[in-house]
């Protein structure tokens, strides 16, 4: 299984084969794709530019470069069209099994 993204404007599908077993999780309007590595219990993520076919790095590196903050391991589920809000998930193992912890990035509340 490989990550795939369907462009509703051009009606074309881009299959990303760079990462082996992976899933397409989210893509922005400007073609930045967020890929979950693995197929059952995604534990990490990659960021990929669909327009240029370029690997933009791990989720953590991309978030640090774009927002200047450190996030836990994981992958991005959603980014708002304006880029101000990001939702992500991190897998965490324990004696009870694997839990999936959600995290987010949002601007500070107005005072």
What is each residue range found by the language model?
Residues 1-111:
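Conserved "turn/edge" positions that cap or connect secondary-structure elements
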């Amino acid at each position: 299984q490989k990550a795939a993204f369907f462009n509703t404007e051009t009606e074309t599908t881009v299959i990303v084969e760079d990462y082996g077993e992976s899933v397409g999780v989210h893509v922005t309007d400007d073609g930045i794709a967020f890929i979950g590595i693995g197929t059952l219990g995604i534990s990490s993520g990659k960021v990929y530019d669909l327009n240029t076919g370029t690997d933009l790095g791990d989720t953590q590196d991309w978030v640090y470069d774009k927002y200047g903050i450190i996030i836990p391991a994981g992958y991005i589920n959603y980014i708002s069209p304006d880029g101000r809000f990001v939702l992500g998930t991190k897998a965490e193992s324990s004696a009870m099994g694997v839990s999936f912890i959600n995290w987010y990035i949002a601007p500070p509340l107005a005072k």
